Amino acid sequence: MVAIVEVKAREILDSRGNPTVEVDLKTEQGCFRAAVPSGASTGIYEALELRDGDKTRYNGKGVLKAVENVNKVLAPALVGKDCREQAALDRLMVEELDGSKNEWGWSKSVLGANAILAVSMALCRAGAAAKGIPLYKYVAQLAGHEAPEFVLPVPCFNVLNGGKHAGNSLAMQEFMVAPVGARSFGEALRMGAEVYQALQRLLKAKFGLAATNVGDEGGFAPDIKDPREALGLLVEAIRAAGHEGKVKIMADVAASEFYSKEAKSYDLDFKSPAADAHRLLTGDQLKDLFKEWSEEFPIVSIEDPFDQDDFSSYAALTAEIGSKVQVVGDDLLVTNPARIRKALQHKACNALLLKVNQIGSITEAIEACKLAQASGWGVMVSHRSGETEDSFIADLVVGLRTGQIKTGAPCRSERLCKYNQLLRIEEQLQGRCTYAGENFRNPSN
């Protein structure tokens, strides 16, 4: 037994200057720290992120209540327990100490997913240390991969920002480049950085220096409105960097952010102050637009193409382009096994975006991943737009063998710490791993 001797939480700041929860969990082997991220475009079905609501402090976004819940509720219950009991202790926190539920499962609405997850992540680090193995190997064991061949993921770099992540006119949230033709993760990182730098030069020449300002995730945020123009810029940057054919395009539409439930339509110009009914698109019209783009551009993945409840549009798109394009559910699924099962029934998508803070514990995140993988889906591990310097998801993606990760542009330290940790893992494995490459949708085959 390796007993937990202390658990302490504090309020720190994330990459947007908003408060978040950090936890130190101590055993006889040392102190293990974790910090949780937060999103800007959040799905309505995500587990509850507990905020204080005190408008006189951090505009109501303080997390002192969540910190108190760790220190006064979770800590006393965990001290003395074996840190290697990840699943049992996650269940204790989620089902007994919090206990709140909704139609989709455990909602964490009493203690807060941000409180529980911070402890769960720190606990995972302590468990790995107790077993004397790297975090990614411990995650693999927790997932039931006893002797896995490790897979290094394709990094999906968000190089053009729009939506809620940037102050420009672009409705769609992320335009990414994915070096599927690289031979290793290290080479993929180089390719991504070279495309990013080529794009910077291109934007400066076309639109001026202001166009190279960056958004929340390190991508550029030029004041363009047409998604087709954004896609064309990526094609041009890939060509200029000398990586045509080896670097593909991915998009995160985040369509729930510009969907009107009343009008049952999508507004690709939702940031414009002037309302115009003529620019609204039905789900079917938007589907046809995605299909057109997938034929015109080297697009291999589209995330959240429709509203989080528009299962029929998802299913129609997946049926039409799903064999050659990954259709990813983020707000649709919120890393929730119950939502994944519903999507499977509807044949709504063919990939899961895995965000640990959407579900609120490492055990539940692993369960969601395994369900998706067992169903033949792809799985992409993801950061959030409000990030910290915690690199946990780098080890998570290797341990779960999902083959793809998105954690921003090759810019801003809270993004690069994940990519750099993956470089270290690849170096540590020294040939005892493969790079997912073009098999990113199903790297185990």
Swiss-Prot record:
Q: In which pathway does it act?
A: Carbohydrate degradation; glycolysis; pyruvate from D-glyceraldehyde 3-phosphate: step 4/5
**Which residues participate in Mg(2+) binding?**
252, 303, 330
| Binding-site residues, substrate | 165, 174, 303, 330, 382-385, 406
Q: Enumerate the PROSITE patterns for this protein.
A: ENOLASE
**Record note on quaternary structure:** Homodimer.
Can you tell me which family this protein belongs to? Belongs to the enolase family.
Protein name stated in the entry: Enolase
Gene (name only): ENO
